[in-house]
Amino acid sequence: MYLNATILGQVIAFILFVWFCMKYVWNPLMSVIEERQKKIIDSLESIKTSKMESERIRNEALACLKQAHIKSEEIIKYAYECKMQILHTAQNEAYQERDKILSQTQIQIDQERERIISELRNHVSKLVIESTEKVIDTSINKIIDYDFVDKIIKQLSNYED
C-alpha cells in the first residue's frame, strides 16, 4: 500500500480538524453538557426535596384535621351539655313557678272559702234571728221561747268561733 500525498494531506487535515475541535468545540460543548447535567441533578434533588416537603405538609395537614375534628367533637359535646343544663334549669324554674302559682291559687281559694263561709254564717244568723222573732211573735209561751232563743244564740256563737 502506497502512502501518497492525498492520504497524507487528509490525515494531516483530519488531525488538524480533531485538534481544532478539541481546542475550540469540545470544551465548550462538554461544559454545556456538564452544566446541563448539573441542572438536571439539581432539579431531581429539588423535586425529591419538594416531594418530601409536600409529604411533611400533608402529614401536618392531616394532623391538623384530626385536631380540628377532635376539637369540633368537644365543642359539640360542650354545646350538648350546655343545652341539657339550660333545659334542666328551665324545667326547675317552670316547676318552681308552677308550685308558686298553685300555692297562691290555693291561698286565694282558702280566703274565698273563708269569706263565703263567713257570709253564710252571717246570712244564716240573720235567718235564724228573723225566724226566731217570728216564732216569738206567734208563740204563746214566752218562757219556752226565751230558752229556745238562748240555745240558738249559743249555737251561733259556737259556729262563729
UniProtKB/Swiss-Prot annotation:
The chain crosses the membrane at residues 1-21. InterPro entries: ATP_synth_B-like_membr_sf, ATP_synth_b/b'su_bac/chlpt, ATP_synth_F0_bsu_bac, ATP_synthase_B_chain. The keyword Membrane applies. It comes from the Bacteria. It is found in: Cell inner membrane. GO terms for molecular function: proton-transporting ATP synthase activity, rotational mechanism; proton-transporting ATPase activity, rotational mechanism. GO terms for cellular component: plasma membrane; proton-transporting ATP synthase complex. Keywords: ATP synthesis, Cell inner membrane, Cell membrane, CF(0), Hydrogen ion transport, Ion transport, Membrane, Transmembrane, Transmembrane helix, Transport. It is a single-pass membrane protein. It holds the Pfam family ATP-synt_B. F-type ATPases have 2 components, F(1) - the catalytic core - and F(0) - the membrane proton channel. F(1) has five subunits: alpha(3), beta(3), gamma(1), delta(1), epsilon(1). F(0) has three main subunits: a(1), b(2) and c(10-14). The alpha and beta chains form an alternating ring which encloses part of the gamma chain. F(1) is attached to F(0) by a central stalk formed by the gamma and epsilon chains, while a peripheral stalk is formed by the delta and b chains. HAMAP family: ATP_synth_b_bprime. Belongs to the ATPase B chain family. F(1)F(0) ATP synthase produces ATP from ADP in the presence of a proton or sodium gradient. F-type ATPases consist of two structural domains, F(1) containing the extramembraneous catalytic core and F(0) containing the membrane proton channel, linked together by a central stalk and a peripheral stalk. During catalysis, ATP synthesis in the catalytic domain of F(1) is coupled via a rotary mechanism of the central stalk subunits to proton translocation. This is ATP synthase subunit b. The lineage of its organism: Bacteria, Pseudomonadati, Pseudomonadota, Gammaproteobacteria, Enterobacterales.
